[in-house]
Amino acid sequence: MNQPLNRFAGHHPIVLVVDDNPAIRDMVSWALELDGYEPAEATEGSEALAWMANAAREGRYPSVILLDLAMPGMDGQEFLQRLHEQGETTYPSPAIVVITAAASSSKMTGLGVQHIIVKPFHVRDLLDVVRKFTT
């Protein structure tokens, strides 16, 4: 398997998967792990922000966030707004990859989204995008 490089040397790149669908989280996390990444999971935006705060206390930061937009609780757009408000002083800038059924790139560009993947998607295509941001 292709072993991507991490901008935080000595560790596998962390990829935070934020999606309310357990089947998607499981499939994506499994593929990421097989490809040499350390997947972390959250079911919605507030859980993702809590994970990031806890990980930051340990000096751990995701290199990439794979984010669903339509979730119960804090959705993807609100998560992006909160993350953007906290700024780079709180977290190094991870690459934001939105995974959505309805691609609307106009509202995402101002919130730091680097790439949009439209559902349904092939796992190999998702891994190619993740590799692009971690090598």
Feature-to-residue mapping (PLM):
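Non-catalytic signal-transmission and effector/linker regions of two-component phosphorelay proteins
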Residues: M1-L16, P22, D26, R57-G59, ...
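Alpha4 helix (beta4-alpha4-beta5 surface) of REC/receiver domains from two-component response regulators
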Residues: E78, Y91-P94, A101-V118, R124, ...
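Helix N-cap/capping motif at the beta->alpha junctions
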Residues: E41-N54, G76
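Charged docking surfaces used in two-component/phosphorelay signaling
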Residues: D26-L34
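Short amphipathic alpha-helix used as the core "switch/output" element in two-component signaling
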Residues: A50, Q77-Y91
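Receiver (REC) domain active-site loop signature in two-component systems and cognate sites
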Residues: M71
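Conserved sequence signature across two-component system core domains
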Residues: V18-D19, A42, I65, I99-T100
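Active-site residues of response regulator receiver
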Residues: D68
